Amino acid sequence: MNLSLTQLSVPPTDAEVDAWASVLTAAHAADLPGVPVPTRVEIAGRLRVAPTTGRHVHFAADEGVASLLLFTDAGNAHTASLDVLQVRPDARRRGIGTALWHRVREELLAQGRTSVSTMADLGGAGQAFAESLGFENVLPLAWYVQDVQDVRDVRDVATGTAGAEHGLPAGYELLCWEGLVPQAWVAAAALAHGSMEDAPTGDMDEQTPAWTPQRLHTVQRLVLDRGGRMLMAAAVTPAGEVAAYTSLVLPDPAAPRALQYDTVVVPAHRGRGLGRAVKLRMLGEATARFPALCEIATSVADENTPMRAVNAALGYRRERGAGIFQIKL
């Protein structure tokens, strides 16, 4: 088909953002009717503020959009992430998605990439399209959701006085920070972040760069620059260690759903209930600071049994299956 594809301005204009949001919200409403749609604040932030791990290239047609993240760190210069490829529901099966993919593939090859990955929900149009192109599911996972209205009785942990009844053993203190981790704790937090190296990654080509204090602050600042808010709850020791932490992001502070980002327990401190403790503290802080918050969503790899058990104990329910799909070029 003769389809006109354009590359968005840098930064995109208001009209370009509106057109992009129109496609995404229409596709989301059709494919995930029970999940809150991404807001314009969230969409504009992702389009206009460059990521920390690479550079975005955004392609648009009248009825479809695609967003490609080309990693720029040395360890990932061979791969990329297809963050978005969506077509308006009433315009599907007309070759628009295929045309967008061909343009994306041209860009990948021109940039010397040998693979690309994307996240897709299982059983939906995204999985079917990805598999038709040759993508394979290299990391099965699922989305889980916690209804905070059902668990507001744990709000007392927001006071910072939570004890053993909330899973915090003696010798630890719970702290919570909004925005950037304080300078006094950023080195310890970055060191703890490195413990995620043993988190399941399946057969993904993408490698996680080393976590440094600078990188941690850069990633956190990106959330803020895109219009969001971020909380981190941590279990710390008298020696100045961050033994465990969890991060919560509100891409749009006015939206009803927040995203649970990383939850990490440093290996030397595992088996003591710290994962549950920091998540309870985070829940208390989030419900106290954001009264309009209705639910928290997180994705967990199927093979990450310990974290799935922690989430189940805190009332998370499985919302939908998903996976990281990857193709070699």
Give the ranges of each region predicted by the language model:
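Conserved beta-strand in the GNAT
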Residues: 58-71, 79-81, 232-234, 241-250, ...
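Conserved GNAT acetyl-CoA-binding A-motif
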Residues: 80, 108-121, 257, 286-299
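Conserved acetyl-CoA-binding loop-helix of GNAT-fold acetyltransferases
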Residues: 87, 93-106, 132, 265, ...
